[in-house]
Amino acid sequence: MESTTLSKPFKNQVNPWGPLIVLLILGRVNPVALGNSPHQVFNLSWEVTNEDRETVWAITGNHPLWTWWPDLTPDLCMLALHGPSYWGLEYQAPFSPPPGPPCCSGSSGSTPGCSRDCEEPLTSYTPRCNTAWNRLKLSKVTHAHNEGFYVCPGPHRPRWARSCGGPESFYCASWGCETTGRASWKPSSSWDYITVSNNLTSGQATPVCKNNTWCNSLTIRFTSLGKQATSWVTGHWWGLRLYVSGHDPGLIFGIRLKITDSGPRVPIGPNPVLSDQRPPSQPRSPPHSNSTPTETPLTLPEPPPAGVENRLLNLVKGAYQALNLTSPDRTQECWLCLVSGPPYYEGVAVLGTYSNHTSAPANCSVALQHKLTLSEVTGQGLCVGAVPKTHQALCNTTQNTSGGSYYLAAPAGTIWACNTGLTPCLSTTVLNLTTDYCVLVELWPRVTYHSPSYVYHQFERRGKYKREPVSLTLALLLGGLTMGGIAAGIGTGTTALVATQQLQAAVHDDLKEVEKSITNLEKSLTSLSEVVLQNRRGLDLLFLKEGGLCAALKEECCFYADHTGVVRDSMAKLRERLNQRQKLFESGQGWFERLFNGSPWFTTLISTIMGPLIVLLLILLLGPCILNRLVQFVKDRISVVQALVLTQQYHQLKSIDPEEMESRE
């Protein structure tokens, strides 16, 4: 832009089609698709870059994504590093002290080699950044009423701003492109992402410049639309030009967000979902040696990552420890079973006292990388946020967050179950900006408890239950222990809570593996990840079953436990217990029952020929009697027939009484 009287307006030009175009653009913007919990804390760095994309100023903090919008205060000369030659910083390195000697009138006094021209009248030459005197002139220009600077947006501008040009004109090829700055016409915009102004007043900047330091600090603030944008990771660009007589010098600067803890790296190669199917680690005894031991420094090797078997066995062992110390009568002899189908975990809503933190605690940065859903929550506990009516039955107490930015950390042994997933701590900024809600829960693995009689009957097949027995899960047996155990005054209070730490550690490790499986499946086959995930735990349990570590009971993988602990080789223990029951059963049988139990083929043979033998014996025993009866019956009928035949062939003579004849005579 050349300096002419008519070419420099005193107000911003407004495009009447601007609002409509902005709405269309916003309708097409897609937010960054991150699978993290919105409450997870990341290490965020807002960076201001020069034209070469070098970071010249940065500010870092630990906050949830899209909740931290600090004021950026880079120096104007820092933005000109490696810029056009008229700034005088072509060879200046980022984050280095400013070049040139200080002014002799500075607070440090007259030093050798100081510049005495700082007291001379300001000239009309182009202000530069290579000396303290030039930086002082630049400060006067940026604060002058009839001068100043203006800023034009880069590629994120709307389509109607095509006439604004590109980097060669610092995106300010025509008037009306400027959206912010410090100039007499007060440029502004309703759609740009930032506003830029001076950070220091003219009176504050003058002594700073004379002491040979960076003295042209700017204040960059995010607008409401800028806070809604989620494309800061790739960065946005602006052009800045000074408003002076003659040619307006300019520079290019950018703003970007750097997330240093954005989650696991994307693997290259085969799907790593089943890469951890390692056999369980067995304790090894040290080799025997007759040599004299020599003193060597003790070095502890790092433990290898737990395989599937170790991870699941630790889950069962933790469940046993917690159950044994709270209900020892239940662990005289029992079977603890892992289910192969989801849900793998269930929550119990509890009341607890969370802690407030003005800065993000350490556990806020280690949240799960994927939004894990807790599909089964029971009980009533503490709720935070806008809880819908469908979930208010889980709330015994509901607390609303007040204004301000702070963090709510869940008590030890608990976790926040939110509609956005599981998280160890909450950001009130996220809760106030959204309609999220969370319930404080204890997390229990879905481990079912079975009595030994039920398990043995299932394998012996001697009898059938008329109805399925009630499955007791760990949540039913131990629910509320973490927050309610001590308050209720149970006898095992402190000891039981200490025992739950092992279970919590196992739960944490297993949840990380489940989350890793979801992430890997999502990256490899998004459409099938939900289906394949249901088979993941089934595959894990299949490895345990094939290795003889557990007994398969319907859809469960069961581990034998008694007061000695969880038996690792559960299949061998099952065979041993079944053999014992078989011997006990046989000892109470007679010789006839033992005869049938001795040989399977003999039992089959007897059952096959028993019917024909019984029929033959009945014929031999009852046949003669029946035959005699039949013969006698036939003879009687023949005699009757013969009598009838004789009666038909002969007639009986009529007898005459002699006395009757004499009387007639």
From Swiss-Prot:
Glycan-bearing residues: N43, N199, N211, N324, N356, N363, N396, N400, N432
Motif (CX6CC): 550-558
Extracellular side stretches: 32-605
Covalent lipidation (S-palmitoyl cysteine), chain numbering: C625
Gene Ontology biological-process entries: fusion of virus membrane with host plasma membrane; symbiont entry into host cell; virion attachment to host cell
Gene3D superfamilies in alphabetical order: 1.10.287.210, ENV polyprotein, receptor-binding domain
Signal sequence bounds: 1-31
Chain spans, region Disordered: 266-307
One Gene Ontology MF term: metal ion binding
Coiled coil: 505-532
Entry function: The surface protein (SU) attaches the virus to the host cell by binding to its receptor. This interaction triggers the refolding of the transmembrane protein (TM) and is thought to activate its fusogenic potential by unmasking its fusion peptide. Fusion occurs at the host cell plasma membrane. The transmembrane protein (TM) acts as a class I viral fusion protein. Under the current model, the protein has at least 3 conformational states: pre-fusion native state, pre-hairpin intermediate state, and post-fusion hairpin state. During viral and target cell membrane fusion, the coiled coil regions (heptad repeats) assume a trimer-of-hairpins structure, positioning the fusion peptide in close proximity to the C-terminal region of the ectodomain. The formation of this structure appears to drive apposition and subsequent fusion of viral and target cell membranes.
Name of the protein described by the UniProt record: Envelope glycoprotein
Originating organism: Radiation murine leukemia virus
Gene expressing this chain: env
